[in-house]
Structure formats: structure tokens, C-alpha cells
Amino acid sequence: MRITGGWSIVRQRLRTALRRPAAPTSSATNGRVPVRSPEELLAQPERLARLQAIEALTRVTPAHFEVLYRSALANYASYVQQLPASEAHHHAGLGGLLDHGLEAAVFALKLRRGHLLPPGAPTELIDAQADLWSYACFTAVLLHDIGKPAVDQVVTLFDKRGGALGPWDPWSGPMQAQTYEVRFVHNRNYQMHQHAAPLLARLIVPPEGFRWLASEREVLGAWLAVISGMPEDVGPLGQIVEEADRLSTAADLTGGIARQTPATRVRPLYERLVTGLRYLIDRGALQLNRPD
């Protein structure tokens, strides 16, 4: 694969975005959030630091990083914009889903270093496929919550004059609007977003990435099982993604005062506790007392 440009182009784009006199990416007026370019969204210092950490944790060349990793991150940022990752749990503020994805990607690539993949394979095969398995970890964790905007949230789009354009169709591609509002679906299924990921994967993973993942059947099979939310086939790849998700969630919940999106009303403590308990029960992380 011969590619020109590389990370220097990305740095230049990010420097340009930082010099623009645009409003901060977290700004929102009357509950409406501006649609931003991926360069603007990723130029925030903390996000830029995570981009650099992701690059440092990979072994690919800068040119390959641009095509395989950077393009996926730009697609992810363009798609999730500043949507929250949850209503009243982790990363519930503006940009929560983007921040969670980037942070979980860093954790996943760090955790991946502690695994020899595929398990039990000869050393030569492990070394030959090392970069591919790392990419599988990266893309799988980036996709683990990508279904939330499609099944857990309803996003309304507005034009530059403030006129309503109707609901966003998340199955078709990124938002095409000036601003947007988000609300959460009530009585939602907390597992459904996991099963939606394969339908949205091509909006995030570049064609070159898909071809690479499909080049090894064992890698592709494990990757598809993980992004489809199939716990019985989780394997080491799924364990890495789950642990990275937990670490990012824990870091946010213990990192200070939680934020919420403008459209989400401030909830009393008891209601947030009930929401959190319901979330844990629905995910199977907390079991109720059962008769013998």
C-alpha cells in the first residue's frame, strides 16, 4: 500500500482548525448543538493527545496510520459529533460518545500488548499478524457503542436559519445540518445497540481496513463476533474490548462532576441511582435475589 501525506497532513489540518475563530466544540444554544467537522472535533487538546497516544501504541507507518486509523477516527468523529454516550450514566455530557470512543481505544491498544494473538499460535504467526490483531482491537472498541445514536437516541436536525429538517437518519451517514438536538428513547433495550454495530461499521471503518480485516478468516470471525455482541464467542478480542470499555467508564464516573446534555433535565440523586442500578441489571452485571 503506497500512500503519501501521512500524519503531517493531519497535524496541519488540526492546526488550521485550532486557528479558526469558531465557537468551542462543546457550545450549545437552547439545547441545539452545532454540527462540526471532524478536524474541529478532534482538535480539542485532550482528544488530540489521545490521537497521538493511539498512534504511539501502533506499529504501522505514518502513511498507513493515516489511511487505516486516522480515517476511521475522522469518520467516527463526523458520525457521533457531540452526542452523549449515555443519558445519566458515564460520559453523559456533550461529546461524551466521542471522548469515550477515543479513551476506550487507547485502553484497548494498551491491553492488547498483554495478549499473544491468536492464542496458541506459533511465534512466527503471532508476529506476522500482530498489527492486524491490533487493528481488530482498535476498530472493535471504536464500534462497540456506535449503535447508540441509531437505536437509543432521536436526533432532530436544523438548518442555518433554525428551521427543523426532521429527524436524522443514522443508518445513511453523518448529519447534514447546521445544528441538532438529541433526546433518549424511553424504555429502550440496553443491549440492542451492540447488535446494530455491524450495520454501521462501513460508515466508520475505511475500505482498506475492511480488506485488511477480511484477509485472515480467524481475525474476521473474532471481530464480527465481538462487534455483533455475541458473548458466547467473545474470546480474547472481546475481553480486551470489554475491559477497555469498563476502564473508560470507570475513569469517567470517578473523574469528577458528571455532565449532561442540554436537552437532558437535571435529575435528583435518587433517580440517577435507580437509573444506574437498572443499567447494571439490564447488562447482567448485577443480579437480583432469586429463590433457590
Model regions and ranges:
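Divalent metal-dependent catalytic cores for phosphoryl transfer on phosphate-bearing substrates
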Residues: 85, 116-268
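Histidine-centered, transition-metal-coordinating active-site segments
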Residues: 2-72, 112, 116, 198-292
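Acidic/His-rich, divalent-metal-binding segments that scaffold phosphate/diphosphate chemistry
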Residues: 29-179
